[in-house]
């Protein structure tokens, strides 16, 4: 009985340390993988063998590291090299640029690129969701509500849009009473 409490304490502490160790190793592994990919892409760029997708991937790596300026520069290079007949790819690229501008709170530029994405893929729900987020962030609740209604036109069972719509409707009703 006298050994049970110390045993449980040491076991619990060991489990916590094991979880921390696994987390640290997974973080190191993912960083290492991203850095190796970064080196590989930069080598392609130095050898002038990079295409739009390589610059896009490089931008995504910088975006994940929160280096937004470098990400935007690489996304713009990707835009210049991207195949114009790849509508889905262009929509994704424009959406990613818009997302990057959203991260640095440049909402006008973000909306510009989101609108460009919708020109290529009008029913791109991720872009519509991002536009709705910006309208909410800028307190343009009526436009946000319209965007979430538009999402529901394309995907009737979209739980995110339904929840946001219910929330916005409540806020708009409450604001009308004030």
Swiss-Prot record:
Q: Which domain of life is it from?
A: Eukaryota
Q: Where are the TPR repeats?
A: 52-85, 91-124, 125-158
UniProtKB keywords: Chloroplast, Plastid, Repeat, TPR repeat
Q: What is its main location?
A: plastid
The chain's coiled-coil residues are none
**Annotated compartments:** Plastid, Chloroplast
Task: Fetch the Gene3D superfamilies from UniProt.
Answer: Tetratricopeptide repeat domain
Q: Which GO terms describe its cellular component?
A: chloroplast
InterPro entries per the UniProt record, alphabetical:
TPR-like_helical_dom_sf (IPR011990), TPR_rpt (IPR019734)
Supply the Pfam families for this chain: TPR_12
Q: Which SMART domains match?
A: TPR (SM00028)
> Which family does the record claim for this protein?
Belongs to the ycf37 family.
Protein name, per record: Uncharacterized protein ycf37
Q: Which organism is it from?
A: Guillardia theta
């Amino acid at each position: 009985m006298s050994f049970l409490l110390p045993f449980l304490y040491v076991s619990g502490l060991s489990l916590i340390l094991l979880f921390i160790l696994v987390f640290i190793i997974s973080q190191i592994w993912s960083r290492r993988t991203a850095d190796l990919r970064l080196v590989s892409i930069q080598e392609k760029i130095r050898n002038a063998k990079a295409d739009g997708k390589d610059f896009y991937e490089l931008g995504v790596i910088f975006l994940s590291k929160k280096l937004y300026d470098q990400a935007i520069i690489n996304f713009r290079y990707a835009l210049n090299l991207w195949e114009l007949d790849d509508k889905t790819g262009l929509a994704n690229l424009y959406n990613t640029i818009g997302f990057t501008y959203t991260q640095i709170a440049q909402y006008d530029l973000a909306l510009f690129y989101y609108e460009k994405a919708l020109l290529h893929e009008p029913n791109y729900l991720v872009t519509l969701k991002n536009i709705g987020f910006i309208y909410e962030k800028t307190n343009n609740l009526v436009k946000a509500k319209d965007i979430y209604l538009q999402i529901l036109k394309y995907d009737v069972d979209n739980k995110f849009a339904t929840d946001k719509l219910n929330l916005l409707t409540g806020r708009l009703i409450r604001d009308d009473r004030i």
